[in-house]
Swiss-Prot record:
Cofactor(s) needed for function: Mg(2+); Zn(2+)
One Pfam family recorded for the sequence: RNA_pol_Rpb1_2
Lineage summary: Bacteria, Bacillati, Bacillota, Bacilli, Lactobacillales
Residues at which Zn(2+) binds: 61, 63, 76, 79
GN (gene name): rpoC
Swiss-Prot/TrEMBL keywords: DNA-directed RNA polymerase, Magnesium, Metal-binding, Nucleotidyltransferase, Transcription, Transferase, Zinc
GO molecular function: DNA binding; DNA-directed RNA polymerase activity; magnesium ion binding; zinc ion binding
Segments forming a coiled coil: none
Purpose of the protein: DNA-dependent RNA polymerase catalyzes the transcription of DNA into RNA using the four ribonucleoside triphosphates as substrates.
Residue ranges with Basic and acidic residues bias: 1209-1220
Protein name per the record: DNA-directed RNA polymerase subunit beta'
Length: 1220
């Protein structure tokens, strides 16, 4: 029966009873045959039998008596096949009745063994019983043995002879089944609860585990004996297909081989039982049947895996679910889709921000059904068939229709790897010739694409809703800001930068300097007549600018001094935006009075005294974009970006920028600098030979000498560059390359690292212009090779980190506006020693204040409680000298399965308050994972300084923190608040003892002798402070302090890693991840509740479980917070679907089945898996309940020539418009 995916609320998993398996089945599979090799028809009673599984051809029985849909539902009287759609062969199951019970390997073999826990037996004993090595006592009767005792064949025979009928023992799965059926779960649970009150140590741990499993059986209505199977389900044949290859051979799914082994052994066992064969033969056959079923369910879990042809292990049912190629990750979480294509991308400078160039052949294929509909509607084709023929012939009519079909039908472009949400954006297609898709040059940054052969995939959203969503939420013009830090991600690069840089450069003494023009037009005419140059400094009557330009009245009466290029640059800015004359933030408030002269004043005198203003570099252009976005939002910004792109391309072409060998200037002082360095090295070597210094000191001094020499050359080289040198312009403007590239071209390459990462003390003194010697070339190759392998490793590591992060945070969604949390987090600037890692401004911007903030000097209120701190407020707070602000934080959010708007604050990608329904968890994971590839893989070695531990940095450090591992070289932390009373060194044992006296007790800590102390004798120390230098183990910190301290420490540490590499990631993303690591508590004392000691549970579930006890005045349970690494946290989620599709699939499913777990489908992943609309954005329950109706008639819109890019409306507004 078909289930409407969007209707059901939750999904439950459990153990299947034999009757349940029979009820699923459409018939028993009795023979191992598959397909008759001559007729290619399925064999009767075989694994592909049409009577059991349905017809192989649509609406046609096996013998051909009934054909056509009109006989639907009839069962043929000749061949017994039901006439129906052949699709049922994907859903109808069969079964095999086993001649002897067989244990399910998941429940016997898993860790811990579930059968072992229920029976209180060791896995070793179970194995001996199941595989017929020992007997087990089922009923001792009068015999002097215990129940569940193991015995040999000989002991069994003697006891059987002596005690006869009352004594009962057995072996194999049958014995296990009897034992499981005889367990009284309720009595066992009571007994264990009593035991728990006395037990300690290992005994207690075992009791807790057993109680957990037994309670699970009691609460789930699963019977323990169902872990042993009498019947095996046979999955539908189309899920284990058999196809004929050329040459008459067959390719088949491994499952068919595994099923055939089971059926063969089962049939043989039946025959042996009918023949009353000797016990030892039957036993052997039962053991083989058990092994065959084990291999079918999980091949290779026990013993050697069953291999197929070529000694390849066969893929069992478990393998079908596991891993990247398993059912979950290959077919449920990501599917191949139709209406998609892929092609090489090329640059499309002629495109608007919201357009992409679609090659005509691709467009015809992608929009085929739409074209066919349009052709028939316009009566250009008589029917669908003739329309199809026209398309195949590429008729002219098709091309005419194509233009209209693709108009306003957005398409999605994706580039792998999709590291963050900007890896998929929507565009309006524009038809282009050729076979390459054209991409707008400004979106390349977000996609991390270049045009050296990159390919991209294109997808066509089909339904109206999908098109609306693509247009409103995904259009590229709306994605100006990066979600990780809220800075513009679409900034001009390369040619566009150099063009605008060249245009806005000023040069003293250019032709026409000091001319005064009455208007911009007049200046342009002068330029066209070659009277002035772009770089010429000129005057212009300020009154000639439009009224909207923000000049003061005084400025309007004067002459403004600027350059011709800047006049042209300012024309692309919005009309009421301040005139930009210098690359500074202050210019955004309004142009400075220093650039104006009185009408009668001599402009030449002014210019003689005034220095040349620098050109607009890449960073400043980015600032302009951010400022325009802040003031005018999306539409105006995307139009500005296009204008800036066009201007940049045009002027970089005009500039005629070239690079030649002569631009790489030689440094005349270089030989002298090198000579000096060689002399210093010789001196150091002499000192070493005389034994004045050690080898490591010599090595260190030599490397220092060469580093210094390279720095001197670098400084002199920069000073010697002409400002008009094209190479210098490229670097200075930020278009391409940095200073070290040019030092290597014209200065010296310097010291290189060897294969082990150690610096080779022979420097590469040559540069690329002179050319390297063979020796130098080989020294250089080490670094190049290491760089390549590092990058490859880094990409894999970073991708896996992102996957784990997404998995742990995927159900964090903004669920409400305010949860009335009663505490916030006090934040101050993050420091590393004396340097600021992240300033207070960055930490409070776009967050909500927990309590009002007042200016300490004047007493003025700067921001109220629950009010957002915007740029102006943040600046005011910093200016007022306030160092600490209490803000609403994700850490203190009380919203279940998510956060509230006030906790999260501003959505960095839009610059607006975040909306209910935003999937902030996934965005957070992407924001932390995406820059992962830029982090280093290396651990820095502190050049042989004694006591300096190697510090883990970069990607390994981030992993160490989020996996909550014990860090390398960790520091000891104080467990008490008090004073350091003594530090005693013990050189013999290479340790030192630090004694701290607290208010109530005194603690002594033993540290390595080389440890660098953070406290001296007599210093005060707080609990949780690190005593010596080094990273703290967050689990230890949590045990000594509270959750908030631990969370803040982890946040600070992660920020240090990213900011050190110059990567800005907003605090809130890291907060989301860390909160997910701390959402569980472990029950310490169950009090008078139904909880079990040692249980891991969500904080919200724990509070709910405690409510009845508190209500009835009973003793509530107590628990302590637990810090889980992200992998563990992702596996401990309440959704078994999400956990199973992440890692350890069989373990997760085994556990979920025994507990009869119910998946409430609150996260994104579980809904994707079952194909339900995800509960984020418009898929949230409150948006889904909205009904829509059309009021009045729909009026056709008049056609507009070139409409600007639409503003991106909010989700709430979209929902409201549906509502209305």
């Amino acid at each position: 029966m078909a289930i409407d995916v969007n209707k059901f609320e939750s999904m439950q998993i459990g153990l299947a009873s034999p009757d349940k398996i029979r009820s699923w089945s459409y018939g028993e599979v009795k023979k191992p045959e598959t397909i008759n090799y001559r007729t290619l028809k399925p064999e009767k009673d075989g694994l592909f039998d049409e009577r059991i599984f349905g017809p192989t051809k649509d609406y046609e029985c096996a013998c051909g008596k009934y054909k056509r849909i009109r006989y639907k539902g009839i069962v043929c009287d000749r061949c017994g096949v039901e006439v129906t759609s052949s699709k049922v062969r994907r859903e109808r199951m069969g079964h095999i009745e086993l001649a002897a019970p067989v244990t399910h390997i998941w429940y016997f073999k898993g860790i811990p063994s579930r059968m072992g826990l229920v029976l209180d037996m060791s896995p070793r004993s179970l194995e001996e019983i199941i595989y017929f090595a020992s007997y087990v006592v089922i009923e001792p009767g009068d015999a002097p043995v215990e129940k569940k005792q193991l015995m040999t064949e000989r002991e069994y025979r003697e006891l059987k002879r002596e005690y006869g009928a009352s004594f009962k023992a057995g072996m194999g799965a049958e014995a296990i089944k009897d034992l499981l059926a005889s367990v009284d779960l309720a009595a066992e649970a009571d007994q264990l609860k009593r035991e728990l009150q006395e037990a300690t140590g290992q005994k207690r741990v075992r009791a807790v585990r057993r109680l957990d499993i037994i309670e699970a059986f009691l609460q789930s209505d699963n019977k323990p004996q169902w872990m042993v199977m009498d019947v095996i389900p046979v999955i539908p044949p189309d899920l284990r297909p058999m196809v004929q290859l050329e040459g008459g051979r067959f390719a088949t799914s491994d499952l068919n081989d595994l099923y055939r082994r089971v059926i063969n052994r089962n049939n043989r066992l039946k025959r042996l039982l009918d023949l009353n064969a000797p016990g030892i033969i039957v036993q052997n056959e039962k053991r083989m049947l058990q092994e065959a079923v084990d291999a079918l369910i999980d091949n290779g879990r026990r013993g050697r895996p069953v291999a197929g042809p070529g000694n390849r292990p066969l893929k069992s049912l478990s393998h079908m679910l596991k891993g990247k190629q398993g059912r979950f990750r290959q077919n449920l979480l990501g599917k191949r889709v139709d209406y998609s294509g892929r092609s090489v991308i090329d640059v499309g400078p002629f495109l608007k921000m919201n357009q992409m160039g679609l090659p005509r052949p691709m467009a015809i294929e992608l929009f085929r059904p739409f074209i066919m509909k349009e052709l028939t509607t316009r009566k250009l084709a008589g029917n669908v068939k003739s329309a199809k023929r026209k398309i195949d012939k590429a008729d002219e009519d098709v091309m005419d229709v194509l233009e209209d079909v693709i108009k306003e039908h957005p398409v999605l472009l994706n580039r792998a790897p999709t590291l963050h949400r900007l890896g998929i954006q929507a565009f309006e297609p524009v038809l282009v010739s050729g076979k390459a898709m054209r991409l707008h040059p400004l979106v390349t940054e977000a996609y991390n694409a270049d045009f050296d052969g990159d390919q991209m995939a294109i997808h066509v959203p089909l339904s109206d809703e999908a098109q609306a969503e693509a247009r409103l939420l995904m259009l590229a013009a709306g994605h100006i800001l990066a979600p990780k830090d809220g800075k513009p991600i679409v900034a001009p690069s390369q040619d566009m930068v150099i063009g605008n840089y060249y245009l806005t450069t000023e040069e003293a003494g250019r032709e026409g300097e000091g001319m005064i023009f009455s208007s911009v037009e007049e200046a342009k005419i002068a330029f066209a007549s070659k009277v002035v140059h772009y770089h010429t400094r000129i005057g212009i009557q300020t009154s000639s600018f439009p009224e909207a330009k923000p000049f003061t009245d005084e400025q309007r009466s004067k002459i403004m001094v600027t350059s011709v290029g800047k006049l042209i640059f300012n024309e692309i800015l919005p009309v009421d935006f301040p005139y930009i004359n210098e690359p500074s933030e202050d210019n955004f408030k309004g142009i400075s009075d220093q650039f104006f002269i009185e009408p009668g004043e001599d402009i030449h005198d002014y210019l003689a005294d005034t220095a040349v203003i620098g050109a607009f570099k890449k960073g400043f252009l980015s600032d302009v974009i951010a400022e325009v976005y802040k003031r005018y939002k999306v539409t105006e910004t995307s139009l500005l970006l296009d204008r800036m792109k066009d201007l940049g391309y045009e002027k970089s072409t005009e500039s005629g920028l070239t690079v030649s060998m002569n631009d790489v200037t030689e440094l005349t002082e270089k030989p002298a600098i090198l000579e000096d360095a060689h002399k210093q090295v010789a001196t150091v070597t002499k000192q070493f030979r005389r034994g004045l210094i050690t080898d490591s000191e010599r090595y260190q001094r030599v490397t220092e000498i060469w580093t210094k020499a390279k720095d001197v050359i670098q400084d002199k080289l920069i000073a010697s560059f002409e400002p008009t040198n094209p190479i210098f312009m490229m670097q200075d403007s930020g278009a391409r390359g940095n200073i070290s590239n040019f030092v290597q071209l014209a200065g010296m390459r310097g010291l290189m690292a060897g294969p082990g990462g150690k610096i080779i003390e022979l420097p590469v003194t040559a540069n690329f212009r002179e050319g390297l010697t063979v020796m130098e070339m080989f020294i250089s190759t080490h670094g190049a090779r290491k760089g390549m392998s590092d990058t490859a490793l880094k990409t894999a590591n970073s991708g896996y980190l992102t996957r784990r992060l997404v998995d742990v945070a995927q159900d964090v969604i903004v669920r409400e506006w305010n949860n009335n949390a009663d505490r916030g987090v006090a934040v101050k600037a993050i420091m590393d020693g004396t340097s600021v890692v992240e300033p207070l401004y960055d930490r409070i911007l776009g967050r909500y204040a927990m309590k009002s903030v007042f200016n300490p000097e004047t007493g003025d209120k700067l921001v109220s409680r629950n009010e957002m701190i915007d740029e102006d407020v943040a600046k005011a707070i910093v200016a007022a000298g306030i160092e600490e602000v209490t803000i609403r934080s994700v850490f203190t959010s009380t919203t279940e399965h998510g956060v509230s708007v006030l906790d999260y604050g501003r959505n960095l990608a839009t610059g607006e308050e975040v909306e209910v329904g935003e999937a902030v968890g996934t965005v957070a994971a992407q924001s932390i994972g995406e820059p992962g590839t830029q982090l280093t893989m290396r651990n820095f070695h502190t050049g042989g300084v004694a006591g300096g531990n190697d510090i883990t940095q970069g990607l390994p450090r981030v992993q160490e923190i989020v996996e909550a591992r014990i860090p390398k070289g960790r520091a000891e932390i104080s467990e008490v608040t008090g004073t350091v009373v003594a530090i005693e060194e013990n050189p013999a044992e290479r340790t030192k003892a630090v004694t701290i006296e607290g208010e109530t007790d005194t603690r002594t800590y033993t540290l390595p002798l080389a440890a660098r102390m953070r406290f001296a004798e007599g210093d005060d120390i707080q609990r949780g402070d690190a005593i010596n230098e080094g990273p703290i183990d967050p689990k230890e910190l949590l045990a000594v302090t509270d959750t908030l301290t631990t969370e803040s420490y982890m946040l600070t540490e992660i920020q240090k890693v990213y900011r050190l590499q110059g990567i800005e990631v907003s605090d809130k993303h890291i907060e989301v991840m860390i909160r997910q690591m701390l959402r569980k508590v472990r029950v310490m004392d169950p009090g008078e509740t139904s909880l079990l000691p040692g249980m891991l549970m969500d904080i919200a579930d724990f509070q709910r479980a405690n409510e009845p006890a508190l209500f009835d005045g009973l003793v509530p349970a107590t628990a302590r917070p637990v810090l889980l690494g992200i992998t563990k946290a992702a596996l401990e989620t309440n959704s078994f679907l999400s956990a199973a599709s992440f890692q350890e699939t069989t373990r997760v499913l085994t556990d979920a089945a025994i507990r009869g777990k119910n998946d409430p489908l609150v996260g994104l992943k579980e809904n994707v898996i079952i194909g339900k609309i995800i509960p984020a954005g418009t898929g949230m329950a409150e948006y889904r309940k909205i009904k829509s109706k059309v009021v009045g008639e729909v009026v056709a819109q008049p056609e507009v020539e070139q409409e600007p890019t639409p503003d991106i409306p909010k989700l709430d507004d979209v929902a409201k418009s549906f509502e209305e």
